[in-house]
Amino acid sequence: MGHRWGFLIVFLGAVGLLGSGYGRQQPSETAAQRCFCQVSGYLDDCTCDVETIDRFNNYRLFPRLQKLLESDYFRYYKVNLKRPCPFWNDINQCGRRDCAVKPCQSDEIPDGIKSASYKYSEEANNLIEECEQAERLGAVDESLSEETQKAVLQWTKHDDSSDNFCEADDIQSPDAEYVDLLLNPERYTGYKGPDAWKIWNVIYEENCFKPQTIKRPLNPLASGQGKSEENTFYSWLEGLCVEKRAFYRLISGLHASINVHLSARYLLQDTWLEKKWGHNITEFQQRFDGILTEGEGPRRLKNLYFLYLIELRALSKVVPFFERPDFQLFTGNKVQDAENKMLLLDILHEIKSFPLHFDENSFFAGDKKEANKLKEDFRLHFRNISRIMDCVGCLKCRLWGKLQTQGLGTALKILFSEKLIANMPESGPSYEFHLTRQEIVSLFNAFGRISTSVKELENFRNLLQNIH
């Protein structure tokens, strides 16, 4: 990922709801205090505090989650990185070698993942075994039983349903390829400048419910901004309904998380002998230091924690889907598949035990008609953001941008499907609520990225402790 898709975080309006008090900072403060002194206590619109999240994530969840994400089921992600940008034509492709993505060869992918039936449970796999050679899942063989045809068509309909928050890739396209996420990690790539700024600017300016008259703090594509614009922006933000305010904070948190990754896996040394990746303290400070960012950095970090709570809550709500006996993490290796499902359920039950979950019941409450319209606006705005990922000029940035937006979109889909999840049958096909393998892989990897960001904040806090 790019230097500074990346440096954008210094400029673009990642937001929180606290006012800035950095004009009163004293020179004697440490660098850690300038980045983290206001990243503590309770989060806005939540009943949870930063310290509780740190303890839960760093010591109870993070190690097990990383082990799960290293398994075959979660490391291989099918993606189309050749889809054209739907919004503009002048994309400048990053030519740096670190922007490139190395796709998998066919023989590197487990057979169970390559088969068309990987999306479904073991019971469903048996039902649709005869259709694996169909060009698309919807092309149902007429010789199949009526029950099987119904199941396949229901799944196809579901995958294209209006409940989805993302513009899904056509993974049957010849341009779609499997990528090993462990061999193509999210890190600094050198992608920077106006092309990268443009992506985030379009996201914030056109898809976050913000009128053009309201100026975001530290926007590199706007000039002449000052304290009055910042005050106007936060007055506007605080006046939004909780749903729109949350939407902005989710995008801000995602942006902040990406920048933590880039600072933590920065190219420190590049010689013909080796490349050395590690923590770049200066880059982290440029993005999150309270003085250098005029108070924006700590706000952005708090929004990262807000994003963490939203995705954590979604995982706690979807436990019944994964507990169903016919669900499996199907790769074709029965022993490993069973072990990984046990690990998955262990992680999900740990998440469910978290004492201070976000309460999503405040979302889309009130008048039903207005709530439904707001929910649809929410969904369409996020879906548009997922389409913007096809405009990113750095392929590795595009890969991780698409995965993380799909993961967040899947989390939102789960949060707004509570009744459907509650009504799922204990066994057999679930027609009303379903997750594809793409959604499952993106959901857990996206949360893994946020979990990693929270863990890296502890590392940066320690590194900055003795720096002034």
From Swiss-Prot:
Q: Which UniProt keywords apply?
A: Apoptosis, Cell projection, Disulfide bond, Electron transport, Endoplasmic reticulum, FAD, Flavoprotein, Glycoprotein, Golgi apparatus, Membrane, Oxidoreductase, Phosphoprotein, Redox-active center, Secreted, Signal, Transport
Needed cofactors = FAD
Q: How does it sit in the membrane?
A: Peripheral membrane protein
By what means is the activity of this protein regulated? Answer: Enzyme activity is tightly regulated to prevent the accumulation of reactive oxygen species in the endoplasmic reticulum. Reversibly down-regulated by the formation of disulfide bonds between the active site Cys-94 and Cys-131, and between Cys-99 and Cys-104. Glutathione may be required to regulate its activity in the endoplasmic reticulum.
Q: Which residues carry this modification: Phosphoserine?
A: 106, 143, 145
Q: Which residues form the signal peptide?
A: 1-23
- The residues the record assigns to binding FAD are 187, 189, 200, 252, 255, 287, 300
Q: Where in the cell is it found?
A: Endoplasmic reticulum membrane; Golgi apparatus lumen; Secreted; Cell projection, Dendrite
| SUPFAM superfamilies, A to Z | ERO1-like
The glycosylation sites annotated in the UniProt record are: 280, 384
> What's a Gene Ontology MF term here?
protein-disulfide reductase activity
Q: Which pairs of Cys residues are joined through disulfide bonds in the record?
A: 35-48, 37-46, 85-391, 94-99, 94-131, 99-104, 208-241, 394-397
What Enzyme Commission number(s) apply to this enzyme? Answer: 1.8.4.-
Q: Does the keyword Transferase apply?
A: no
Q: How is it modified after translation?
A: The Cys-94/Cys-99 and Cys-394/Cys-397 disulfide bonds constitute the redox-active center. The Cys-94/Cys-99 disulfide bond may accept electron from P4HB and funnel them to the active site disulfide Cys-394/Cys-397. The regulatory Cys-99/Cys-104 disulfide bond stabilizes the other regulatory bond Cys-94/Cys-131. Phosphorylated on Ser-145 by FAM20C in the Golgi which increases its enzymatic activity. Phosphorylation is induced by lactation. It is also induced by hypoxia and reductive stress.
GO BP annotations, alphabetical order: cell redox homeostasis; intrinsic apoptotic signaling pathway in response to endoplasmic reticulum stress; protein folding; protein folding in endoplasmic reticulum; release of sequestered calcium ion into cytosol; response to endoplasmic reticulum stress
Q: Please give the GO cellular component terms listed in this UniProt entry.
A: dendrite; endoplasmic reticulum; endoplasmic reticulum membrane; extracellular space; Golgi lumen
- InterPro entries hit by this protein: Ero1, ERO1-like_sf
Q: What does this protein do?
A: Oxidoreductase involved in disulfide bond formation in the endoplasmic reticulum. Efficiently reoxidizes P4HB/PDI, the enzyme catalyzing protein disulfide formation, in order to allow P4HB to sustain additional rounds of disulfide formation. Following P4HB reoxidation, passes its electrons to molecular oxygen via FAD, leading to the production of reactive oxygen species (ROS) in the cell. Required for the proper folding of immunoglobulins. Plays an important role in ER stress-induced, CHOP-dependent apoptosis by activating the inositol 1,4,5-trisphosphate receptor IP3R1.
Homology family: Belongs to the EROs family.
Task: Describe the protein's quaternary organization and the partners it interacts with.
Answer: Predominantly monomer. May function both as a monomer and a homodimer. Interacts with PDILT. Interacts with ERP44; the interaction results in retention of ERO1A in the endoplasmic reticulum.
In Swiss-Prot or TrEMBL terms, this protein is called ERO1-like protein alpha
* Taxonomic path: Eukaryota, Metazoa, Chordata, Craniata, Vertebrata
